[in-house]
Amino acid sequence: MYIKAALLIVVLFGVASQITSALYLKQADFDDPRMFTSSFGKRSAIESEPQAYPKSYRAIRIQRRSMDDLDDPRLMTMSFGKRMILPSLADLHRYTMYDKRGSDIDDPRYFLFSNRLTCRC
């Protein structure tokens, strides 16, 4: 009796998996050549929009960072990388000591020059 019930469960599972896999393969039609092109998912436009070139360029400065700059506690906060009014890492002294710890570091006002102590070691 238990053997018949086990066989019935196996057969029902096999039939159900065959039906669902056939439905899935029918839903995902792999014969469509548009799925294998580099423009799949992009908007198809006959006329491409002209590219707008800027009239003026803004020069940027790329600086190399030393390992001492990684001691900045701003790098460990959740607000790192967001746009805020803060001095850059190059403006901070190498041996800057912060007078507060904890959740105060997440406050952007904490990093203004009036709230820090500088050690001239």
Curated annotation (Swiss-Prot):
Signal peptide segment: 1-22
Upregulation: Up-regulated when diet is restricted.
Keywords annotated in UniProt: Neuropeptide, Signal
Knocked-out gene: effects: Reduced lifespan when diet is restricted, and in the presence of the oxidative stress inducer paraquat. Increased pha-4 and cup-4 expression when diet is restricted. RNAi-mediated knockdown reduces lifespan and resistance to the oxidative stress inducer paraquat. RNAi-mediated knockdown in an eat-2 mutant background rescues lifespan, but lifespan remains greater than in wild-type.
Entry superkingdom: Eukaryota
GO term, biological process aspect, one: determination of adult lifespan
Function field: May regulate lifespan in response to food availability and oxidative stress.
Protein name: Neuropeptide-like protein 7
Species per Swiss-Prot/TrEMBL record: Caenorhabditis elegans
